[in-house]
């Protein structure tokens, strides 16, 4: 394994135009940096023959993530870390070396951040739009994916399982289940229609989280997207849902047009609105785990936000740690049975 690691590190060193790798040693990594995907992730300190040192991240990644990173590296890795893997064939987890961006995730105060993220994301999306035939390693978010996987196994099934296991959860949240199933099914139909439509299909990240999430780093003044473990050939709209409000999404639309994409704004608006529920569904399971045993006043902040998004399609604050004012409002709605009602807060 050690010899293999050196070969992989050398491959990345060549991409980054460094020297010859002399040896590797284990570096320090926090749990937060390692992430919560369950993948094996390490930081290794690299010493080159010229005496220079730097660190690299090693991740045991699935084929689709290794290939996504290879594709983005080959395209110039302007807003993704450079990466290298020896194995770009085996459909099993294999080691990949990744450029270490450090631990600074947020830009300093005063940086106009959203336009930079918009520009970078639009560049990645348009570069890979409608290239499904060239990316045979990338799974497709087709009707089967949405209906039999994302709205069931990934999300609402976890809700139903906890209802079966925890009578307290069932009493408090069980009334939401029929509407959750109904709204998520409508969402799946919309996404399946976008797959058939084809125009918006591209290499998507799928797990960009929100501005206080962990998958967009501030590095050398630019946004860098990391952790492509949830990548799919899917509508680009799902990458906008968690991170951008409608005003920022309009900046993204303008970037699409500047990159030569032909799309009416009314059509863009309709499709991005339909995609908002993606965030509620993709993060429903983590929010249920966070609720744990309750009470909702202490552990239900994330869960109420995800339920609000799925039940109404509204997305008032794009933050994991959203405001206490909004939490109080959602708690009140939850207690008086109006969480499922529209408030007009679609931003």
Residues covered by each model-derived region:
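Active-site ExK catalytic segment of metal-dependent nucleases
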Residues: 55-61, 99-101, 227-229
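Active-site Asp-x-Gly
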Residues: 203, 217-262
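Active-site catalytic-loop/activation-segment of kinase and kinase-like phosphoryl-transfer enzymes
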Residues: 137-193, 341-346
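Conserved structural core of kinase catalytic domains
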Residues: 85-117
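ATP/Mg2+ or Mg2+-diphosphate-binding catalytic cores
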Residues: 282-347
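Conserved kinase catalytic-core helix
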Residues: 104-143
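Conserved NTP-binding catalytic cores of kinases and kinase-like/nucleotidyltransferase enzymes
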Residues: 1-94, 192, 196-202, 217-223, ...
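Catalytic-loop of the protein kinase fold
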Residues: 203-206, 210
